[in-house]
Every structure is written in structure tokens, then in C-alpha cells.
A protein has these predicted regions:
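Mg2+/Mn2+-dependent nuclease catalytic core
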Residues: 57-154
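Conserved pre-motif I regulatory segment
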Residues: 173-220
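A substrate-engagement module of RecA-like helicase motors
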Residues: 178, 185, 243-359, 367, ...
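Signature of the SF2 helicase/ATPase Hel1-core->accessory helical subdomain module
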Residues: 231, 237, 258, 339-358, ...
Length: 827
């Protein structure tokens, strides 16, 4: 029987944790601040103190061999020559309330480390010391207990005997899973064209010899070939051969998680003996069963019955779920179990993930530095990563590592706090003053168009360039200064220092006045401050600082321009990663921005008959900003020609809502007989579903939808058959010119001379190709893609077209388009 690998912390917390979920303010960032304090205490101990000592030992309980491992915070020998295991804990509990028996898990961890180290070193006795560091007062309290090795071994053995039934369940499951997955057959009678090739690439990546940073694979495969099954099936087969312990299926949006769930359901339906557990992790806000009056989760034992006593009941819930035989733990299943056992569905999903084989969730569970799954990714593991819609990852990753803070947050906090003097009020005023001076400095360096620095300043004082009234705050040298926006390569320390100084009094106030009316507003401020300070600690040459003055406000953004080192570090936590999409062109761009320059990249050709796709371009139309007004009527005429060629459903994609509205107003005025539907901004899930429902099969009347490229209908939408028979794409999708995009352009110009491509052309064309991919979804589909912009005829754009677009026809005018469409539908 293979040994059961068991981390010390997992063993102790699983068996001994009790009580409730309590997310009330605790005054510090446990993960980051706690680690910093650990290092501080370890350094202060002097010579002879070994920090972060890895320990591992073999034990047996109930016939099960265990490998127990973990890192002891510290080990040293005291003046009496006794070996001491030091367990360090940071806490917000007041020093007077810190008790020796405050948390049994803390002693248990130290005692297990003592058992491992004692046997390893042949010791007869040793001490366990609990070191508590009170984060508000810097008080250090220490408690010491004396043990014989025999006592520690007995304690560890008792824990293992309690854990043995769970280990036995999991070992039996893994054996059953291995047999099942190694014999797993493809769930369809035959592979679609392209599926076998894609599956083979993924299987080879997952079964390749492990490397320090993991194997990386980029797969571009046409829309409609069945990418989800083509990557899931080989990855599961790899787990069946012993290559990979868990599979993480990571998505850009909740709507694509269902594709993974459906693929796994198909595998289960095709093999009744399939042993596979899958869990879908959904954001807490969406699954909360007991939100507060404002609709937010209230994770406090006195407010939420699902939080109260959670740890006393969760193991019972886990046992029931693991024994029920279904193995499918989606959002609905977790909600049902949460109600049955009165446990939080969000936390239940996280705890259940440790017992599941496939974990489906958002990108942020791996890549986000704040919310990633620490239980899996704080150290490397035998994990397989499947990254869906990977073309979305560069922008999502940039957002995850960036942060913003506004002066208005300080103003609102001061207003909420009310009148009176306090340490917090003083700190708020200092920070507010620094941001006020920062706004003056930005307005001086970069007056908004049509204004002066004086008009930007609402303080009642004049601060024109060259005047005697100079801003009292110094900003780093500006790389860009225009229209109220300044970019700097260096951190604006003069703004960050008062925010850092604000942290302690803000923590104190939040802890001392939890019931104050202003608590919610100041708690929001605290998290905003922490977010920008965390980003400042990551800040290096891959970032830029943006300061924007608008009216009385100043916004500070620390922008991650290049997320490659951070994505690389995240992917290195696993054995292998396959990043796939219908649009990863050019591959070198995606490999560079995602930190995988040496990764293998494959591009599969479309399996669909070229004659089923009518592909036309009207290069006589220019959609450049200066020609927008002149383009409206020709675009309307082209859309009318498309929508009138055959009764059916069509989509027209635009680069912006404003442009969309202009054309829609002209179109509906001139072609009122053609039904239209407009994508509104900010649609929720219900609005999205309602929009798509209008695209019904076998329509009796033509419907032309107006949508935005790169939005919720421009990708990730499956309208097969005659639910969609044509789309028009207006423009080449370039992001709007902005200071941020210009900084991206400058950054990559300096890196490789391709700044315009990285900041504008390639992201824009990705949106174009994604939108075009909505039309042909199956072998039987037939439809039209119409490109409206003269730049599609330029080689810099045309070379980005996929191979199956080789039959694209450039037409003179709308009349020729009408004739071509008539011929296409007649075939």
C-alpha cells in the first residue's frame, strides 16, 4: 500500500479545529504580515536557532503507512541543553486575553513536530514552546511545556488513529480512481477533426517528466471542435497513469465553468464506473445563503447560522458528501448540502476541494496574489492546470497585480468619522493633505485640456505653472504628463508614506469601535489602503504609477504593465499547464506576456468546410475615429445587406457602446423593418440570458443584434445551428487610445520594439477573431462573417488571419456584397 502523504497542519486542523467562521476585522493581513513577523522573531533569536526546519517521518496507524511532513517554525537548544520546538503564532487577541490553552491546534502542531524531530534525532525528551506575538502592541508571550518522546509519539499516534478512516477512504478512492481513469474511453463514438491532435498534445504535456517550473503548453484550436473535452479527457487519463494528483480547470468567467461541468457529466454518463470527484468553486457573494441587508455575506457567528459552529459540523458534511457516490459538487449541490448540515457553502466548497480530483474555478484561485488557494499553491504540488480562454489571461493578470486608491476615499472616511479630534482623524488629515498636494502637483504638470492648473484646484488658491504657489509635495520624474494624467516609473513615496502611517490608527479604531456607524466606511478604506500598499511591495520595473487629477479627486494607480513574472511563478506551482483558446495569435505574444517564452505552442487547423463560411470585407469603409461620422451610413447599408440576404439571426460587433449607438440610431431610422436588439452596458446574468434567448432556432423574422467586441457576447457564446447565421465586425478592435495603453506601448517598445502590436494591434485582433468565431460552431453550420474596415486589407492585420480564412473576398461596395451573399445562400 502506498504511503499516505499528510501535512502536519492538515492533520491537526482537520481533527482539532472547532468553533465558528468569524471574518470580523482582526487588524492585520494574516498571510503577509504573519509571515513577516515570523521572520522578524526568527532573526531575533540569534545563533543556534534553526528557522523553518523541514521535518518528515514515517508512521503507521490502522494498517495505513503515513508520511507526515511540515516545517517547524524554529528549533533550538536551551541553556539546560534541552531541545525546544518553537511554534510561532501572530494574533490580534489582546495580550491580557492570551491564554496558554487558547487554541489546542497550536500546541498540537508543535507536539507533532516534536515527535518527528525527537525520533529523527534519537531524543528522550524535548520541550514545545508557543510564542504568541500580539500585532498591535508588539507584546511577545511564551508558554513552554515539557514532554518525553514517548508522550509525543503517543499523541501523534492517537491523531493518526483518528485520521485513519479518512485516509483509508481516500486511499481506496485513489486506487479506484486510478483504475477507472486509466481505462477511461473517449465519450463519443469518434473524435472530431482536430480533437485527437489536441488531446495528444495535452496528454504529452501532462505526462512529461516534471521540471522545476512545470511543463507549459499553448494550444490554439478553432471554436467548435470541442476543446473542453479535448483537454479534460487526456488530463484525466494522465492522472490515471499517476501523472498528477489534482486537476484545476481555470476559467475567465462563470459562464464557461458550465462547459467543464457538462464535459465531466458526459464522461460520467458514458462510464457508469467512473470514479471522479469534481467541485466547482463560486465567489462567496454568489453562493451566500444568509447575506446582510445590503446583500453582502455576513460571516459572523452572531449573524449567520451557517458560520456559527461551522467547524463543529463540517466534517460530518464532508463525510456525507464523499460517501454519497455522485462525485459532482456543483453550485447547486453545495447549496443543498450547506442547508442540510447548516454550514457555509463557500467554505464547504474550499474544504471539499482537498478531497476532490477536479477543481473548477476562476483564474483568481491560482493567479490572484490575495485570494489564491493557499492550501494548494503556497508550495509546489503535483497539480495539472487547464487554463480556458487563455487569451483573457494577460489583461486579467494585469488587473490582479494592479491597485488603485482615490483621495475621495479619505474625504468620505473623514466625513463618516464626524467632528472631533483623535489619532485616526489626525492621520486621515495628513494623508488627505498629501493627496491634495499631489493633486495640485499633477494639475501643474498636466493641466486638463481647456483648463489651467488653477481651475483644477478647488482649494481656493491659485497654483499656475510658474507661480509662487508651488505644490508642497514632490512627485517622481514624469514619463508622461498630459490632460490631468501623470505617469511615473518610480513609486510616488510621498503619497504612500501617509497611507502606511494611517494603517495603525485605522486598525486600532476598527478594533475598538466595531459597532460604530462609520465602521463599514472605514473598513472599506482599510482594505483599499492595504491593497495599494501590497501592490507597492510588488512594485518593480514591470509596473508604472499613474496619477490622475479629476476635479477635487486624485486617483493613484499602481499598474502592472507586464504580468509575466507573476504568471510564471503561479504556473510553477504545478506539474504541467495547458493554456488553450480559439485565438492565441500570434503565439509569441501570449508566451511572452504570460511568462512562458520557451513553451511549446501548437495551432490546429479548422475542421469545418471552408465553403460553409462566407467571408467578405468592405475595405472602402474606414472606422478610424476621425472618419466615424462618415462611416455610419455605409455601415448601416452593409448591415442591412447582410441582414436582408436571408431570414435569420445576426450579430454586429462594435469597438464601443458610443459607436454602436450611433450606427443603431441611423440603422433603425432607415431600416425600420429589420428587427434589432441592443446590448446594454452592465448586463447581469439574467440580462445576458434574456438577450441570448432572443436568438431562437428556426426564426421566422430576421433579428440583428448590436453588441460590443470583447464583451459578454463577443466570446464564450455558443449559438449553434441557425441560432446565428452571420456577424459583422466593425473595426479592427483596437483598444481606445489612453494614457494607460500608451504606457503599455512604451514599455513593450523598450522591451522588444513591438509596442503598438502589444498594446493595440494584437489585443484588438483577438477580439475580432473571437467575435467571428461565434458563427461556425459545428460541421453542419453555415454562415457569414463580414469585416468592415480598410485596415483588414493591410498586411499587418491580414497576416493575423487564421489559415481557414484564406478564401476571404475583398469587395468594392454594398452592391457587390449583396450579389455575393445571394450567391452564397443559393449554394
Amino acid at each position: 500500500m502506498p504511503a499516505f502523504r499528510l501535512p502536519v497542519r492538515q492533520l491537526v486542523e482537520f481533527l482539532l479545529r472547532t468553533g465558528s467562521i468569524d471574518s470580523r476585522f482582526t487588524g492585520f493581513d494574516r498571510a503577509n504580515e504573519g509571515a513577516r513577523i515570523h521572520r522578524k522573531l526568527q532573526k531575533a533569536t540569534g545563533e543556534g536557532y534553526a528557522a523553518e526546519v523541514f521535518l518528515s517521518g514515517e508512521r503507521e496507524a490502522a494498517g495505513i503507512p503515513f508520511t507526515i511532513e511540515g516545517r517547524a517554525d524554529g528549533i533550538f537548544t536551551d541553556e539546560a541543553g534541552v531541545t525546544v520546538i518553537d511554534e510561532i503564532k501572530t494574533t490580534a487577541v489582546p495580550a491580557d486575553d492570551i491564554a496558554e490553552d487558547m487554541n489546542p491546534c497550536h500546541w498540537a502542531q508543535g507536539m507533532v513536530y516534536g515527535a518527528l524531530y525527537g525520533r529523527q534525532q534519537g531524543l528522550e525528551k524535548l520541550d514545545v514552546r508557543l510564542t504568541y506575538y500580539q500585532i498591535d502592541t508588539d507584546d511577545i508571550l511564551r508558554f513552554v511545556r515539557h514532554f518525553t518522546l514517548e508522550e509525543l509519539e503517543a499523541f501523534l499516534q492517537d491523531l493518526l488513529e483518528q485520521y485513519a478512516p479518512w485516509a483509508q477512504r481516500q486511499l481506496a478512492w485513489k486506487e479506484q480512481r486510478g483504475v477507472s481513469l486509466s481505462a477511461l474511453d473517449f465519450p463519443f463514438p469518434a473524435y472530431r477533426p482536430g480533437q485527437r491532435a489536441l488531446a495528444g498534445e495535452v496528454y504529452r504535456a501532462c505526462t512529461a517528466a516534471p521540471s522545476k517550473s512545470g511543463v507549459r503548453l499553448f494550444c490554439q484550436a478553432p471554436t467548435g471542435i470541442g476543446k473542453t473535452m479535448s483537454v479534460l479527457f487526456p488530463a484525466l487519463r494522465a492522472i490515471g497513469t499517476g501523472c498528477g494528483e489534482k486537476l484545476f480547470y481555470l476559467t475567465a468567467r462563470n459562464t464557461t465553468q458550465s462547459a467543464a461541468e457538462d464535459a465531466i457529466a458526459r464522461l460520467r454518463a458514458s462510464d457508469s464506473k467512473l470514479a471522479l470527484r469534481s467541485v466547482t468553486l463560486t465567489a462567496k457573494e454568489k453562493v451566500c445563503l444568509h447575506p446582510d441587508a445590503e446583500g453582502h455575506p455576513a460571516c459572523l457567528p452572531e449573524l449567520c447560522p451557517y458560520a456559527n459552529g461551522y467547524y463543529d459540523r463540517v466534517n460530518t458534511a464532508l463525510k456525507a458528501l464523499l460517501d454519497d457516490g455522485t462525485g459532482r459538487f456543483d453550485r447547486a449541490a453545495l447549496a443543498d448540502a450547506a442547508k442540510q448540515f447548516t454550514v457555509c457553502p463557500f467554505e464547504l466548497g474550499l474544504d471539499l476541494s482537498e478531497w476532490c480530483d477536479v477543481i473548477i474555478g476562476d483564474y483568481n484561485y491560482l493567479f490572484d496574489p490575495v485570494v489564491h488557494l493557499r492550501r494548494f499553491f503556497d508550495s509546489a504540488g503535483d497539480w495539472l492546470f487547464l487554463v480556458d480562454e487563455a487569451h483573457n489571461l494577460p489583461e486579467r493578470a494585469r488587473a490582479m497585480y494592479s491597485a488603485r486608491f482615490c483621495k475621495s476615499s479619505l474625504t468620505e472616511a473623514k466625513r463618516a468619522l464626524g467632528r472631533g479630534k483623535s489619532t485616526l482623524k489626525t492621520a486621515l488629515s495628513k494623508a488627505d493633505k498629501a493627496f491634495l498636494e499631489g493633486r495640485k502637483a499633477v494639475s501643474t504638470l498636466a493641466p486638463r485640456r481647456g483648463s489651467t492648473a488653477a481651475e483644477e484646484d478647488d482649494s481656493g488658491q491659485t497654483s499656475l505653472p510658474g507661480s509662487a504657489e508651488t505644490p508642497a509635495i514632490g512627485l517622481p520624474a514624469a514619463d508622461y504628463a498630459q490632460d490631468g494624467t501623470v505617469f511615473c516609473k518610480e513609486l510616488p513615496s510621498a503619497l504612500l508614506a501617509p497611507l502606511r502611517a494611517l494603517t495603525a490608527p485605522l486598525q486600532d479604531w476598527l478594533e475598538e469601535d466595531p459597532d460604530a456607524e462609520a465602521h463599514a466606511a472605514l473598513l472599506d478604506l482599510y482594505f483599499e489602503v492595504q491593497d495599494i500598499l501590497r501592490a507597492s511591495e510588488r512594485y518593480d520595473e514591470h509596473f508604472a504609477a499613474q496619477l490622475t487629477a479629476r476635479g477635487s479627486d486624485l486617483e493613484l494607480q499602481l499598474l502592472c504593465l507586464d504580468p509575466s513574472p507573476f504568471v510564471d511563478a503561479s504556473l510553477s506551482a504545478g506539474r504541467a499547464a495547458a493554456l488553450f483558446s480559439a485565438t492565441l495569435t500570434p503565439p509569441g505574444y501570449y508566451r511572452t506576456v504570460l511568462g512562458c517564452p520557451e513553451a511549446r505552442a501548437v495551432a490546429l487547423e479548422s475542421p469545418f468546410p471552408a465553403e460553409n463560411l462566407g467571408l467578405y470585407c468592405l475595405p472602402s469603409i474606414s472606422t478610424r475615429y476621425r472618419q466615424r461620422d462618415a462611416s455610419i451610413r455605409p455601415i448601416s447599408d452593409a448591415l442591412a445587406a447582410l441582414a436582408s440576404s436571408r431570414v435569420g439571426n445576426y450579430l454586429a460587433f462594435f469597438p464601443s457602446y458610443a459607436y454602436l449607438r450611433q450606427v443603431w440610431e441611423d440603422f433603425t431610422a432607415r431600416y425600420p423593418d429589420i428587427g434589432t436588439l441592443v446590448q446594454e452596458s452592465g448586463l447581469d446574468d439574467a440580462g445576458r440570458a434574456a438577450f441570448l434567448e432572443r436568438f431562437s432556432p428556426c426564426p421566422e423574422k430576421t433579428l440583428l443584434g448590436f453588441g460590443v467586441m470583447g464583451g459578454i457576447f463577443g466570446e464564450g457564446v455558443d449559438l449553434a445551428g441557425d441560432r446565428l447565421i452571420g456577424c459583422a465586425i466593425v473595426g479592427v478592435g483596437l483598444p481606445q487610445v489612453s494614457p494607460r495603453q500608451e504606457m503599455l506601448r512604451r514599455y513593450y517598445d523598450a522591451q522588444n520594439g513591438a509596442g503598438f502590436d502589444y498594446a493595440y494591434r494584437w489585443p484588438g485582433m483577438n477580439k475580432v477573431l473571437q467575435a467571428a468565431g461565434r458563427v461556425i460552431r459545428t460541421q453542419e453550420d453555415k454562415g457569414v462573417v463580414l469585416l468592415l474596415d480598410d485596415r483588414f486589407a493591410q498586411s499587418e492585420y491580414a497576416r493575423l488571419f487564421p489559415k481557414h480564412w484564406s478564401h476571404l473576398e475583398y469587395l468594392r461596395d454594398t452592391e457587390e456584397l449583396k450579389k455575393k451573399l445571394e450567391d452564397f445562400w443559393a449554394e
